[in-house]
């Protein structure tokens, strides 16, 4: 059971339908304790061939529709935004998957930002060095931005990282568990 001030932050695919078009997004949503939508962020930097098919419209126009048959690309979000949770009095920058790897592109109202949340599905790396490399970028961004990073990775490394890149709490990819963040500065 959720408490009154609890919030749920999770990754989910969302669909927006306007007039005669529909778009699918890789999204992070924030829900209140009654599961009402507080805020959402749609991923901007999409993974080629994983989240979108490059040249999909071109292939369709020249008669190679079979290449993209049954495939519906994600749409890119429009802008990065700071998410504010008023009843918790905190603000965070949402980053989905590999958006965390881009240096120098996060700074968004830095003085108002308490931390960065990065959610990721690292299962596509398989049994490789990939999840560890991806996780390392979370530490780099914490240091670069001078912010705490909360990273939740399905089939990857989850962690709470200090602004100096120190791992406060970590769950390896094979571990099940919860990282509870009680406070931050």
Question: Where do the model's predicted regions map?
Answer:
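Enzyme catalytic cores with a strong preference for nitrogen-chemistry domains
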Residues: 1-185
């Amino acid at each position: 059971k959720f408490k009154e001030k609890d919030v749920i932050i999770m990754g989910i695919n969302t669909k927006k339908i306007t007039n005669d078009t529909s778009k699918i997004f890789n999204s992070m949503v924030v829900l209140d304790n009654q599961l009402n939508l507080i805020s959402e962020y749609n991923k901007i930097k999409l993974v080629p061939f994983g989240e979108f098919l490059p040249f999909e419209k071109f292939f369709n126009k020249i008669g190679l529709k079979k290449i993209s048959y049954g495939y519906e690309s994600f749409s890119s979000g429009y802008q990065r935004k700071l998410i504010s949770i008023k009843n918790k009095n905190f603000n965070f920058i949402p980053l989905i998957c590999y958006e965390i790897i881009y240096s120098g592109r996060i700074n968004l109202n830095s003085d108002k930002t308490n931390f960065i949340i990065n959610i990721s599905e690292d299962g596509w790396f398989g049994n490789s060095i990939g999840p560890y490399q991806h996780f390392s970028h979370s530490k780099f961004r914490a240091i670069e931005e001078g912010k705490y990073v909360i990273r939740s990775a399905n089939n990857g490394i989850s962690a709470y990282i200090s602004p100096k890149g120190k791992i406060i709490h970590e769950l390896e990819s094979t571990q099940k568990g919860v990282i509870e963040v009680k406070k931050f500065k």
